[in-house]
Amino acid sequence: MLKHDQFWHYACQLYSNKQMEEVLLHFQNAHNKNVNLCLLLDYLTELGKQLSQADVEALILCAAKLDQQLLSPYRLLRRTLKDEHHAYPNYASARSSLLKAELELEKLQQHSLIELVNTCLPSHNTGANNLALYLPESLVHQFMRAKS
């Protein structure tokens, strides 16, 4: 069983690398890929756990549902604040509050993804490469370069 807090710690550590942050945001904005799913698939690979294509498809659906219901509208709200209300005297405080809430929504998405993975039966495989089931090969290479 995967633990939510261990994955959160792994994801935060990886995302704190500026190059990794840029690559993941590029995947999200230019290729419509989910950052949390990329991080989770890499985490599982690090643990030597290989998912099936069907498992990854289920994770994609789970992430997409939460993106549609919660994260995308929230990101739009944050961008609107930045683009149209940056002159508001308490802009910095409002933006900080929105970012904090968005981070909680990211945690919620990670929690849901971990819960779903815990229902799967990943095989043990020291050569696991879960990202290859989600990203084109060129993006997998970009991810791995940013990680190293």
Task: Please tell me what each predicted stretch does.
Residues 5, 34-41, 57, 68, ...:
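Non-catalytic, well-ordered alpha-helical scaffold segments
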Residues 8-14, 18:
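Acidic, glycine/proline-rich low-complexity segments that act as flexible tails and inter-domain linkers
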Residues 20-59:
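N-terminal interaction modules that seed assembly of large macromolecular complexes
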Residues 23-26, 72-76, 108, 127:
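N-terminal intrinsically disordered, cationic/polar leader segments
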Residues 25, 41-45, 60, 78-82, ...:
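Amphipathic alpha-helical segments within well-ordered protein domains
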Residues 32-36, 44-49, 67, 103-106, ...:
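Short alpha-helix boundary/capping elements
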Residues 53-87, 94, 100-101:
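Long, charge-dense
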Residues 81-148:
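A charged, amphipathic interaction segment
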